[in-house]
Swiss-Prot record:
Pathway: Amino-acid biosynthesis; L-tryptophan biosynthesis; L-tryptophan from chorismate: step 5/5. Its cofactor is pyridoxal 5'-phosphate. The modification N6-(pyridoxal phosphate)lysine is found at K99. Tetramer of two alpha and two beta chains. InterPro entries: Trp_synth_b_CS, Trp_synth_beta, Trp_synth_beta/beta-like, TrpB-like_PALP, TrpB-like_PALP_sf. Keywords: Amino-acid biosynthesis, Aromatic amino acid biosynthesis, Lyase, Pyridoxal phosphate, Tryptophan biosynthesis. GO terms for molecular function: tryptophan synthase activity. It catalyses: (1S,2R)-1-C-(indol-3-yl)glycerol 3-phosphate + L-serine = D-glyceraldehyde 3-phosphate + L-tryptophan + H2O. GO terms for cellular component: cytoplasm. This is Tryptophan synthase beta chain. The beta subunit is responsible for the synthesis of L-tryptophan from indole and L-serine.
């Protein structure tokens, strides 16, 4: 693997976020990355492209998504009323999650480049589903690589992809999860990039993918900022999003980064505990290295090999993280915290029980952190407004949660009303 020489001077857009990012890929892929970057720059400068994309976001995806204030949480107690939790409802985007925002943008880019085939990787199946429906809409061939373990635990999404006409290829190598699906997708793209576009599903990978994904997801924070100002007359105190690779979080953070008074928090999967060896908290507990074409934080062992990540949530089960998140952490602009499986399961049940919303397990990590902060604010009598990215709906997780709670009855929510 080689990095493109003189990278800072030979790309149209900045390829690094501080020391993180770059293009650590086989030289044979550099022309494809150059073509993608040029197409992206041309498209974003085109009023016609922006109008077409805006039309899809409005009429097909259902944007803008609403902002919902939790009416029953945090639970009643002394000091009730100090903390307010608002949910940015990306679970209501067509396809069931935030993923469709940037997928529509990238598929339009692919058509603009004359590509006829789309390659994607998926973990929980949400990105694969979004890619499959976008390809069905726009008449492109779709191939989705998915870890064999994820295929087994996300059967409803596998069938949804197939209904949209996608070919789903289970990946047996390695741990059979998202990391291995990315590897296979990159191999495919290396061999077929003249007719194929690799539609990366997270804000990681080689430049220009982190920038492209952020810009197509930025609509989340642009809408949320305007909605918070309209509803509360001020910006939120805290913005929280779950972080695996980091796409929904960078979309949720993007328009708040320059607002120094807004605290940005990424909720990483602490799995069975940060000291258990079974987690995916890349920034909280990882090291700097190179994975999937970018320099960022990753999970690796004492020999320098990439470690297998773990999370109850397939969409957070990734041993790397987007380079802009690494930079936000390194500069202190954002804070990244670990949320355990047990905490996420409690939050999943709380939101379903008390607000009538079934969140994705991924989003439940962010909501779990919001509940913690709200509890502290209530106890201390501190006025606090928390904005949570509810990145996806939990239909895909219901069976998994049911089985897990049957096996671990101590995690079943006790009714506190």
């Amino acid at each position: 693997m080689t990095e493109k020489e003189n990278l800072g001077g030979s790309t149209l857009l900045p390829a690094y976020f501080g020391e993180f990012g770059g293009q650590f890929v086989a030289e044979s892929l550099l022309p494809a990355l150059d073509q993608l970057e040029k197409a992206f720059v041309d498209a974003t400068n085109s009023p016609e492209f922006r109008e077409e994309l805006g039309g899809y976001l409005r009429d097909y995806l259902g944007r803008p998504t609403p902002l919902t204030e939790c009416s029953n949480l945090p639970l009643s107690g002394e000091g009730k009323g100090f903390a307010r939790i608002f949910l940015k409802r990306e679970d209501l985007v067509h396809g069931g999650a935030h993923k469709t925002n940037q997928v529509i943008g990238q598929v339009l880019l692919a058509k603009r480049m004359g590509k006829t085939r789309i390659i994607a990787e998926t973990g929980a199946g949400q990105h694969g589903t979004a890619t499959a429906l976008a390809c069905a809409l726009m008449g492109l061939e779709c191939v989705v690589y998915m870890g064999a373990k994820d295929v087994a635990r996300q059967q409803p999404n596998v069938y949804r992809m197939q209904l949209h006409g996608a070919k789903v290829i289970p990946v047996e190598s390695g741990s059979g999860t998202l990391k291995d699906a990315v590897n296979e997708a990159l191999r495919d793209w290396t061999a077929t990039f003249h007719e194929s576009h690799y539609l990366l599903g997270t804000a990681a990978g080689p430049h220009p993918f982190p920038t492209i994904v952020r810009e197509f997801h930025k609509v989340i924070s642009e809408e949320a900022k305007a909605q918070m100002l309209e509803r509360t007359g001020k910006l939120p105190d805290v913005v929280v999003a779950c972080v695996g690779g980091g796409s929904n979080a960078i979309g949720m953070f993007a328009d708040f980064i320059d607002d120094e008074g807004v605290e940005l928090v990424g909720a990483e999967p602490a799995g069975e505990g940060l000291d258990s060896g079974k987690h995916g908290a890349t920034i909280t507990n990882g090291q700097i290295g190179i994975l999937h074409g970018t320099r960022s934080y990753l999970m690796r062992n004492s020999d320098g090999q990439v470690e297998e990540s773990y999370s109850i949530s397939a969409g957070l089960d990734y041993p790397g993280v987007g380079p802009q998140h690494a930079h936000l952490h390194a500069t202190g602009r954002a804070t990244y915290v670990g949320i355990t499986d047990a905490e996420a399961l409690q939050a999943f049940q709380y939101l379903a029980r008390y607000e009538g919303i079934i969140p994705a397990l991924e989003s439940s990590h962010a909501f779990a952190y919001a509940l913690k902060r709200a509890k502290t604010a209530e106890e201390e009598g501190q006025n606090l407004t928390i904005l949570v990215s509810l990145s996806g709906r939990g239909d895909k997780d219901v069976d998994h949660v049911r089985r897990t709670l049957e096996e671990n009855p101590e995690l079943i929510l006790k009714d506190n009303r």
